[in-house]
Amino acid sequence: MAKYVKTEQGYQEIEATVAPMVGEKMNANNPVGTGSFSMGRKSGSVIGTNSHAEGFNTTASGERSHTEGASTTASGNSSHAEGASTTASSNSSHAEGMSTIASGEGSHAEGVSTLAEGNSSHAEGNTTTASGNYSHAEGVNTHAEGNSSHAEGNKTNARGKNSHAEGDGTIASSTNQHAQGRFNVADSHNKYAHIVGNGTNLSIRSNAHTLDWNGVPWFKGRPQFGGTAQDQGSQTVMANGDKEIILASSTANSTKKFKITVDDSGAISATEVI
């Protein structure tokens, strides 16, 4: 016989077989039940075996699933949905927060409008997407597309397998690549292991520094060697195919710098940099 419980929404049917029973009460010394249980389950929704639905307008249709909050759905087996308008649609998935979706097997979505669709993926923050298997997206509007990739910050995209993108609007498009800074130029040919972007926005991209897989660095500006980041000691400059070396004076407390050049005869000259 169906049993009912009074809630704020009126009388709700409890789809459960609870034993042992004493009248209409569970035995406090042995509160064991089998079957499904609901308080606030969405009317007409599918009831999963051994599922539990509570809150308002919730659906626990997966076997052994649990849903709570408002308008949440746990349709995957052993899934869990909580919060508001969240969906855990795959087996062993977990969705929490607001308007989040965990559609990958064993995935976890939390925050606001996040999507964890890769198997064992994790999406958190606001409007993030973890579509690669074992991927992780966090921050705001980030995308972890490659398997085992990680995207964090703001509008970053980790497209390559095992890639990592961080900062603002960066793209790590190749396997095992790392991109940081802001708005770098995407490298789809896997030339670089490391990229530091210094672009202006999503439409105006540029790089400050790259490092290729042979360990060869490139710098947009003049690299600094020695001294400190504040005093900018000696410098090495490569521009227009010519090589110049700028060295700080070795005299104590001197602030002078000299440009060292070598001509075709091998003669070396030093000119003070004003």
Model-derived regions, located:
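Extended, folded domain segments that form the structural surfaces/walls around functional sites
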Residues: 229-240
